[in-house]
Amino acid sequence: MDKKIGVYICSGCGIGDCVDKGKLAQVAQGEYQIPVLRTSAAFCLEDVRLIEEDIEKEGVNNVVVAACSPRVNTDIFRFPAASVERVNLRELVVWSHPSGHEETQNLAHDSLRMAIVKAQKTKIPSPFTQANERAVVVVGGGVAGMTAAVGAADAGAKVVLVEKEGELGGFALKIARQFPKHFPYRELEEVGVDLLVRETRSHPNIEVLTSAQPEAISGQPGKFEVSIKANGEVKKIAVGAVVLAIGWRPFDPSQLERYGFGFSPNVITNVALEEMNRAGKILRPSDGKGIKSAAILLCDGVEDEANIQHGAHVSYLVALKQAMYIRERCPDSTVYIIYRDMQTPGQYEYFYKRVQEDAGILFTRGKVRRVSCDQNGGLVVDLQESLLGPEAQLQVDLLVLATGMVPVPSESEGLNLDYLQGKGLPLSKYGFADSNFLCFPYETRRTGIYSAGCVRKPMDLAAAAQDGAAAALKAIQCIEKSSAGAAVHPRVGDLSYPSFFLQKCTMCGRCSQECPFGAIELTPEKNTPFVVTNRCRRCGTCMGACPVQIISFDDYSVDMVASMIKAVEIPEGDDEKPRILVFACENDAYPALDMAGINRRELPASLRIIPVRCLGSVNAIMAADAFSRGFDALLLLGCKSGDDYQCHFIKGSELLATRMENVRETLSRLMLEPERAQVMTVEISDFGSLPTRLKGFVDSIKAIGLSPMKGF
């Protein structure tokens, strides 16, 4: 199909008062000979029909809308038969720059030029298609796993639930009672896991395999092949998505020897106390005598960082619950809860108050200096910085250590993935399934595999059930999107995917190494890359990684960005008008710029902004093109990296930091100052301070001087 571009220039929302739309029309038709051009005071209202008519009657299949931000009116400017490129005249030109100023008009011209060139280079993506399975495998038969299985089955999916033990229930079978789930949230409740087990086993859409474990998982969303070993036999099934709910194991108490663990049998863990209460008696382990006094220590000091991360607020709630256990079993006892912090989120604050009302339960903030034995077999707990005084001692019969919940490792007991990047899931610092915790909590770094329960973060039974239901919804979404050949997240609905011009491939394998999601594999014969399409999240990290630029998308490529760079009009050096190219991450940085415009914060007119899918997609050659073209500086706006990363694609900013070394080498080769290329971390909430930071960067470039490459 021949490409036909239509440009639609809006003059509403103050656009026509700030810039000359006639001159914009001249850019479109005079410089690019656009065959269809229309103007309107509001294309977002009834005049949208003009665009629809041009698509239907004039054969327009590439639409350029010069109006408001691409983040608004997305439903209005969506045309199935055409690709759409938005020119952000309203927020990033009119609302953020002086009206009628020459540089404001120049910015509008360049914004339109870049959009037209992008439209020229864009192909309408064709979706990847395959035979998809409407089935889900859930690994783990605890509360999270069973809830996920029931949720997916209720949605119409066939579910296979795989549990390594001989019975369903997971760690919930070892819990005596659970925290309050019902108003007024004061009293402990029965666990009730047997009801969930019966519901799971009786559901017509669920097949339960106990004493079973996955031997291998291969394939991609929509069509995973799972090999399951059960009762000595291997069974192969095809599913569309996977839910991982393999649970947790107690934190290793040998790391808590400083609190007397292993020194005295009367120093036990909270797991041991749970078992005691479930058995019906709480006695002193050393001699079987009753408890007159006990202390529960929340191991939450600076030296207990790992235990804190594995316990979170759950350890605090368990301490409250177990204090009630001891008081119920030993009514004349006194229980001390020793803490540094106390966290009881949400409705659990009512439960906290209920425990405080018990005169036999005493709370003291403090730090345990030493635990020793007295001559009667009891324990002496020496406290510092306590509410009882600078130095204090507690005489107790039993010391309970609050240990955390360590996630079961996915590699050894959960998945056994047949992926180039390894058998297990990429994990966070403390062993939980890695994900963008705020935006995509259930999505692991293996597309189509969703984590639920304590493999994702520490949580109680109620939260685990909620987690399982949420993971089931994500699994169903994955199956639906995969069947349409569309990305699941974060670029939901994106039909594009990477293609490779293998004739130029150097077989370095960098694309497969840097892909955050294991979407690129290598052929065993030639070591050339190929994409496992439905694993791909369309971030373009592979495109940024390739040293010979052989990777592209139908609607995003190195050639497209290079053409957009060349479309910008660079003033002659004696004009003293700097031009700074900005690559802005579309997930945080670009919305922050947008918000600055909405709030009428002035931005430097010298910036020429190109949104990118992720900073990880920025190839070093793009920087070289910018400086060779005569840009005075390059600014890359991206997300926070590190353990607390905020990148939607995990490590885009981190990868770019490495590639910046190549950019600086390019600058040295061009005899340019390295300060001309900078990376700036931006959160969406930074819109208030971002204009000042940008102005500071522009001023620093002016101080260095304009690029000597202008005019070459």
Describe the residue ranges of each PLM region:
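Residues forming the flavin
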Residues: 1-530, 534-578, 587-590, 602-615, ...
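Eukaryotic N-terminal intrinsically disordered, low-complexity regulatory regions
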Residues: 592-595
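Divalent-metal-activated hydrolytic enzyme cores
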Residues: 674-712
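Long, charged, low-complexity intrinsically disordered regions
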Residues: 580-582
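Thiamine diphosphate
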Residues: 618-627
